Structure formats: structure tokens, C-alpha cells
A protein has these predicted regions:
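Short N-terminal targeting/anchoring amphipathic segment
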Residues: 90-111, 122-128
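N-terminal subdomain of nucleotide-sugar transferases
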Residues: 1-50, 96, 117-122
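Short, intrinsically disordered, charge-balanced linker/junction segments flanking boundaries
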Residues: 111-117, 144-149
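Short catalytic/ligand-binding loop motif for oxyanion handling, primarily in non-cytosolic enzymes
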Residues: 12-14, 43-47, 109-112, 131-142
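A conserved catalytic-core segment of Leloir-type glycosyltransferases
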Residues: 30, 35-100
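Short, conserved clusters of charged catalytic residues that mark active-site
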Residues: 17-21, 84-85, 110-114
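Acceptor-binding helix/loop patch of EC 2.4 sugar-transfer enzymes
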Residues: 63-76, 125-149
């Protein structure tokens, strides 16, 4: 089985480190081949890669900055990521020969919600924070239970 793990980074932040450990564990299992697609690669692991392009690197930075700027108009100070903008990762994923996609921490405009709806491969989600439940916030302030509604 070929698995593609997708995360913003492989080593930058707790969720990234956890996703990377899962990727390494999967590669230790016979009959499983795991790769990891990231925006920000910090390891020397040959099975971790990004779509290497100066243009794409600048686009990710610009989209992330724009997303942060848009969040300033929200009266909520919780850390958030809207993931409005489409990603070049979508085309790569859909044209690949992976059997399963594992979505980890895809915030900072790694993949948009619309991109996820266009995936043509089976995927699973590994939750590293509350973003998947809250829609844009990474976690909620204590006592904030609006996400339950």
C-alpha cells in the first residue's frame, strides 16, 4: 500500500513532528510505502518532499500572509487558518498513484476546504488540533463551546 501523508511541515511544530513520526512508523511496516508532501521541509528524509519551485514557495507565503491578514477582521483572537486558497498540491495528489492520503495539519493554506472536496483518492484525517471541528480555529478559548452547535 502506498500512503501519502500531507502536512504543512515535517519538523516545524508539534503537529508536524507527530505527522513525521507516523510517516516513519508506516515505513517500518512491510508492504507499506509512506511518503510525505509538505510546504516546509526541514528533514533530510528522502521520502519527504515538496513541490520545489520558487514561484510556488512565494505563492504559499503570499497566501498564508493574506489568510493571516483576513483573520485580523475577525473579532476572535484565537489562532486560525481559513484555508481559502487552492493549492498546487491538489493536482499532484490527484495525478499520483497513492492508495491512501492521510491529511495531517494542513493549515496555513496547505490545502483549501474546496481542494479537499476535489480529492479523487480515499483519504483519512489525523487531527492534531481542533481545526477540523471548528472550521478555522486551531483551538478554542476555555469555555467556548460554539463549535458544538
Amino acid at each position: 500500500m502506498k500512503i501519502l501523508n500531507i502536512s504543512y511541515s515535517d519538523k516545524f511544530g508539534g503537529a508536524a513532528k507527530s505527522a513525521y513520526r507516523i510517516h516513519k512508523l508506516l515505513n517500518s511496516i512491510k508492504k507499506i510505502k509512506s511518503d510525505m508532501l509538505v510546504v516546509k521541509k526541514l528533514s533530510k528524509d528522502k521520502n519527504v518532499f515538496t513541490i520545489d519551485s520558487t514561484y510556488l514557495s512565494l505563492m504559499f507565503k503570499f497566501k498564508n500572509y493574506l489568510g493571516i491578514l483576513l483573520s485580523k477582521f475577525d473579532n476572535n483572537n484565537n489562532p486560525k487558518s481559513y484555508n481559502f486558497f487552492s493549492s498546487p498540491f491538489l493536482q499532484y495528489i490527484n495525478n499520483s498513484n497513492y492508495d491512501l492520503i492521510n491529511l495531517h495539519w494542513i493549515n496555513a493554506e496547505t490545502l483549501s476546504i474546496e481542494d479537499i472536496s476535489k480529492l479523487n483518492k480515499p483519504f483519512i484525517i489525523t487531527m492534531h488540533d481542533m481545526w477540523w471541528l471548528c472550521g478555522s480555529e486551531n483551538y478554542l478559548e476555555y469555555g467556548d463551546e460554539k463549535w458544538k452547535k
